[in-house]
Amino acid sequence: MASFSTNEFRSGMKIMLDNEPCVIIENEFVKPGKGQAFSRVKIRKLLSGKVLEKTFKSGESVEAADVVEVELDYLYNDGEFYHFMDNVSFEQIAADVKAVGDNAKWLVENNTCTLTLWNGNPIIVTPPNFVELEVTETDPGLKGDTQGTGGKPATLITGAVVRVPLFIQIGEVIKADTRSGEYVSRVK
């Protein structure tokens, strides 16, 4: 199994800690005036999502996580699992609700998503950065209603709620950013 020295730590690197895959968020190399140098690392556990800080002595080795990211197309949800398919091999992978998490509201059939696999099992499902969804419910925009430029809430076809400008009507398709949950533009 591959391993990394603390001198090789970079943001986004995936390592094993307590038999759980983790991703490095921040890495700070500290060389005090007296004593041995060390790395102060901020880590997010991929299974639980917990963020913690850990210090490693300079030159210490850490096992690399056997984590693979693959691009798969979202097919459907059967109530218990979300099903994805590889366009090349047509192999299907089922992800549970825990792996999908809050991203379920951004999953659109046939959109390409990034799945993080550990030991062949999906642990994180990341939707595309932008999705196009239809507005199913929103207040009508009244003429002259310009007090407060915050817009109005709109419910999308997947159940996600996004703040949209006043001119957006029911039935229109909008482009939303899945990372921030914000309205980007109207799709023509």
Swiss-Prot record:
One GO MF annotation is: translation elongation factor activity
Any keyword Amino-acid biosynthesis?
A: no
Q: In which pathway does it act?
A: Protein biosynthesis; polypeptide chain elongation
Q: Which residues carry this modification: N6-(3,6-diaminohexanoyl)-5-hydroxylysine?
A: K34
Q: Which UniProt keywords apply?
A: Cytoplasm, Elongation factor, Hydroxylation, Protein biosynthesis
Q: Which segment of the chain is annotated as a signal peptide?
A: none
Report the SMART domains cross-referenced here. Answer: EFP, Elong-fact-P_C
Q: Which CDD domains match?
A: S1_EF-P_repeat_1 (cd04470), S1_EF-P_repeat_2 (cd05794)
Instruction: Give the principal location in a single coarse category.
Output: cytoplasm
Annotated localization = Cytoplasm
One GO cellular component term noted in the UniProt record for this chain: cytoplasm
PTM per UniProt? May be beta-lysylated on the epsilon-amino group of Lys-34 by the combined action of EpmA and EpmB, and then hydroxylated on the C5 position of the same residue by EpmC (if this protein is present). Lysylation is critical for the stimulatory effect of EF-P on peptide-bond formation. The lysylation moiety may extend toward the peptidyltransferase center and stabilize the terminal 3-CCA end of the tRNA. Hydroxylation of the C5 position on Lys-34 may allow additional potential stabilizing hydrogen-bond interactions with the P-tRNA.
Similarity remark: Belongs to the elongation factor P family.
NCBIfam families, per this entry? Answer: efp, PRK00529.1
This molecule's function is given as: Involved in peptide bond synthesis. Alleviates ribosome stalling that occurs when 3 or more consecutive Pro residues or the sequence PPG is present in a protein, possibly by augmenting the peptidyl transferase activity of the ribosome. Modification of Lys-34 is required for alleviation.
What is the protein name for this chain? Answer: Elongation factor P
Encoding gene, per UniProt annotation? efp
